[in-house]
């Protein structure tokens, strides 16, 4: 988001200024404020770190950029150690206590003593310190459940349970393949639906029925029948299209919007977001891992 904004400001400075576009540059400072708010009680000036898998991770530049913009440490699991009930960072001056970690590592890898024992990315003993309330983790372990696409079907009920209110925006009709009736409908209408694996991301494990061949649909039908819990389906939604420069021409391409929200003492919604664009003509897959791109998003 921040990179796209900088490119547009340099490329079209006059258009940008005349349009009075709301800034997104304060996101790192807002993130830092949120992380500071999460610090354990009685910690006045918390030491904060961004926990990254390392230089070979595809998002390493983002991790490095955010840590620099916030003025906090960028650390890997090998840079941290649990000692005397706290998490410490190894420095040239000895151990330095860490109070908050913005983790960019999946749950399974954050502590080999609790989760995957073969993990070299996390910190042994981290979860014990977390349970004692001596370090804050963002996002908290377990929040990755929201990545399970099946959860989407229950969002209206979740909103109703926690707020006593109805959802403002209706859900896209969603079919959960573990339900016999839903599964029968999905298998009978594969040519009309988008089918997604519950725990895949990046555009993988997905079937766009109207664009798939009969053989591809048959293969997916077999997967659904074998592991119904792992699949959900939705109608094929017509994504918005925007003009996109392709070579020396301007053509329409499908896009979606990924907003950014921070939840600290207050809720911050970034006045912009990441507009992801499918660069392949006719494609509905906007993920960067599948050849997608991104665009700056203006809120006036």
Segments the model singles out, each with a brief description of its role:
Residues 1-300:
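Domain-scale recognition of functional cores that engage charged ligands
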């Amino acid at each position: 988001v921040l990179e796209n904004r900088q490119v547009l400001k340099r490329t079209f400075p006059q258009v940008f200024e005349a349009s009075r576009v709301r800034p997104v540059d304060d996101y790192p400072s807002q993130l830092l404020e949120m992380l500071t708010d999460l610090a354990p009680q009685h910690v006045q000036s918390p030491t904060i770190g961004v926990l990254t898998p390392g230089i070979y991770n595809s998002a390493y530049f983002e991790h490095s950029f955010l840590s620099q913009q916030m003025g906090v440490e960028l650390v890997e699991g090998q840079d941290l150690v649990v000692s005397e009930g706290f998490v410490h960072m190894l420095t040239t001056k000895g151990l330095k206590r860490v109070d908050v970690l913005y983790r960019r590592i999946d749950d399974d890898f954050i502590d080999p003593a609790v989760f995957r024992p073969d993990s070299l990315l996390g910190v042994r003993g981290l979860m014990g310190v977390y349970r004692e309330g001596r370090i804050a983790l963002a996002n908290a372990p377990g929040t990755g459940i929201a990545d399970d696409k099946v959860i989407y079907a229950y969002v209206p009920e979740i909103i109703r349970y926690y707020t006593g209110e109805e959802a403002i925006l209706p859900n896209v009709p969603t079919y959960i393949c573990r339900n016999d009736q839903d599964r029968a409908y999905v298998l009978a209408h594969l040519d009309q639906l988008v089918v997604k694996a519950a725990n895949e991301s990046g555009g993988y494990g997905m079937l766009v029925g109207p664009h798939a061949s009969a053989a591809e649909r048959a293969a997916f039908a077999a997967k659904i029948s074998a592991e119904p819990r792992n699949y959900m389906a939705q109608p094929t939604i017509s994504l918005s299209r925007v003009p996109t420069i392709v070579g020396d021409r301007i053509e329409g391409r499908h896009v979606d919007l990924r907003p950014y929200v921070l939840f600290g003492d207050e809720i911050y919604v970034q006045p912009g977001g990441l507009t992801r664009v499918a660069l392949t003509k006719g494609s509905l897959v906007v993920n960067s891992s599948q050849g997608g791109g991104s665009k700056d998003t203006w809120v006036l």
